[in-house]
Structure formats: C-alpha cells, structure tokens
C-alpha cells in the first residue's frame, strides 16, 4: 500500500544526510578548482613581470646607444669649430690636451697634435707615428701630401673645414713651431 515517494522512476527518496554529504563533497572539490586557476595565474604574473623587466631593460639600453650616437654625431659636427678655436688660443690656455699628446709622442710637431685630435685621420696617425724619428721638414711634407688624399676620402662638409685647417697649418708650420 505504501508507495515510495519519489520524484521519478520509482527511486527512493534520499535522506537529508545523504544529500548534504554529497553537497559537501562537491564544495570540497570546488575550492580545489578555484585554487588551481589562482596558482596558474600567480605563475603567469611572475613570468609576465619578468618579461616586462627584460623588455624595459632592453628598451633603456637602446635609448642609451641612440643617445651616444647622437652625442658622437654632435661632437663630430662641433669638433671642426673647436679645432679652429684651439688654433686661435694661446699655448697656455689650450695646452692641456696638447701636453698629453706631447708626452705620448716624442719629436712631434704642433701639426701632429692637430691631426691627432681630429677624427677620421687614422691613416695619417699611422703615417706620422711611423716617422717619429725623421726631421720636422719631412713630417711637414708627409702631412701636407697625405692631407689632400685624406680630404678626398672624407665627406664634403667635414673635408672642406679640415682641408682649410690642414692648409693653414702646413703653410704656417714653421711659425707655429717657434711660438711654443
């Protein structure tokens, strides 16, 4: 006479304890599911953070290299003007760089110092270094002959100002040597 009370298919109704236990089991599994994504997020955050640091560091060094290139290009454009000013200065005022050059090379003339301070004269430096023991007249001839070849190799704006300086220094080299 008694018919089991069931929702469908004649199954017995579960006791409230059994249904609560099943919910608890599901709840215990749920925190594990929730924790797993958090752990994976923490790992990815750490990886992303490290990637950001590396990217910033590379970007920062790239800016520094660009700034150095800009500074060098500015120095290259300023150097001809500074060299012209150095020629006009008294020997006492602009002698710090010249003194260093004199100490490092024996028997060099003031023209050699001007050539050493100018950029893009590596061949001239080698020629002048190889003829340290020769007379001053030989050095003047070598540097005036070599400067015409060097100036043709340089860019037009740099070559024009340097050519003027080389011509001035080769014409008045005997006078400049007497001023020291």
UniProtKB/Swiss-Prot annotation:
Feature: compositional bias, Basic and acidic residues: 10-26
Q: Which Pfam families match?
A: SPAN-X
Compositional bias, Low complexity, is annotated for 170-180
Query: Which residue intervals make up region (Disordered)?
Result: 1-46, 64-180
Q: Where is the composition biased (Acidic residues)?
A: 82-169
What family does the Swiss-Prot or TrEMBL record give for this protein?
Belongs to the SPAN-X family.
UniProt-recorded name of the protein = Sperm protein associated with the nucleus on the X chromosome N2
